Amino acid sequence: MNDYSQWRPHHERGQHPFDRLYPQLKDNGAYSEWAWGLSRLVDGLQKLGPEATRIDTERIGVTGCSYAGKMALYCGAFDERIALTIAQEPGGGGAAAWRVSHTLTEVEDLDHTDYHWFMESMRENFHGDSVYQLPYDHHQLCAMVCPRALLLLGNPDYKWLADEAMLPSAQAAEKVWQKFGIEDRMNYSIVGGHPHCMLPESQMPLVQAFIDKFLLHRDAKTR
């Protein structure tokens, strides 16, 4: 997925496959372009068909941790063919609300993030207290996954991840699932005591329950 768009700051913006296809959109951030790439992969799987791929495109899940946790969340939000999204420790720009992160210290907030991952205009327009002028925030990004399944995983041992900003974002987003009476399709878990991007045993049952229920169509308790 990294090959679709800009991965690190020293990689020149506008020189990746997405940018060559859509040069007028070169100011887009990498996350929207990576999500576009995932959608094209799903297009290919659907075109080839299950006989060739042995993949049921009605049961596609996407997951990732850290920057890839952000990537998973964007992919799940923007493609309705993704049945299950599991975003592990996605940090700022993932599930954490920018407005809340601005009130915290030592976290990935809008003034301290990798701007090659987002629109170039974001820092110029919404730096400092201007963050409160954002027309949207990331509880809405999470809610875009609804009515499909979403699981958010946090790790409070890494302050940079801004789980204090992810929690209210997740709580706000889950109200959308609750409104439709499908609250079993969304959950979140914040557990410490383990390295970054390592799934602890305490979270494994919840992860397995989401996989069982939304990818394998088995009975499982997700709330």
Please place each PLM-identified region on the residue numbering.
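Solvent-exposed loop/turn segments at secondary-structure junctions
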Residues: 2-5, 67-69, 91-93, 156-159, ...
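Primarily recognizes the serine-hydrolase "nucleophile elbow" in alpha/beta-hydrolase
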Residues: 39-105, 130
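Alpha-helix capping and helix-loop boundary segments enriched in small/acidic/polar residues
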Residues: 25-32, 62-63, 73, 128-136, ...
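C-terminal catalytic histidine-bearing segment of alpha/beta-hydrolase fold enzymes
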Residues: 171-172, 176-223
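Conserved strand-to-loop "acid loop" that flanks and positions the catalytic carboxylate
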Residues: 146-164, 192-193
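Cap/lid segment of the alpha/beta-hydrolase catalytic domain
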Residues: 1-57, 94, 98-100
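Extended catalytic-interface subdomain
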Residues: 33-44, 62-65, 87, 121-155, ...
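Mobile cap/lid helix-loop segments that gate and shape the active-site cleft of serine hydrolases
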Residues: 50, 87-141, 162-170, 178-183
